[in-house]
Amino acid sequence: MSNGIKVKKRDGSIEPIDLDKMHVMVEAACEGLAGVSASQVEMKSGIQFYDGITTGEIQEILIRAASDLIDLEHPNYQFVAARLLLFSLRKSVYGTKEHPTLEGQILAAVAQKVYDHNIFDKYSLEEIHKVDTYIDHDRDLLFTYAGLRQVVDKYLVQDRSNGQVYETPQFMYIMIALTMFAEYPKETRLSYVKRYYDAISKHKINIPTPIMACLLYTSPSPRDATLSRMPSSA
């Protein structure tokens, strides 16, 4: 459904606003959660549509609306807001709801000069393909809004000058695991990668900021140096 108003998409194209599409997105964010309502989110948003409003602005308004509904009696709105943020993030990073393969993600990020190409020196393509089977993007749904917002704002690889993000949480987690165990024996390291990825992506353990954030230390063993400096770096 459209009321004649035009919206500006992320790629710069202009098209009529699709209120039905927006409703479907909010319904998807509420799916399976008790005590939440898509109509409440839409009413809370109080969106004033105007010609030229961007799809990103619409999504941010909906995210804020859902987060404003979080209270002691309706805690599940924290997951509605998180899902809306996740939908926006995936669309911004990939231009679609579908994720690339791990190899595709690494190649794209290397081309954008935000990942180091030496990951292909450390791991064979066969290993990369094997690790790809470990990734479960549905674990993004475990995030609360506060948790996902912190990850997006602080830890995902991004260009701080313009806010462009280059990865989603599960790729962040698997890249941390791959980097942590790159120097381990090839016979056993993938088992460590999987176990560590499972632990952090299921939020069974929290990663200290020195490992989550980007650091540049001069040391023969960057991983050990990072761990040893945690008290002074945190």
Please provide the spans of the model-predicted regions.
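Extended catalytic cores of very large enzyme megasubunits
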Residues: M1-S219, R223
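Positively charged, low-complexity/disordered segments
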Residues: S221-D224, S228-A234
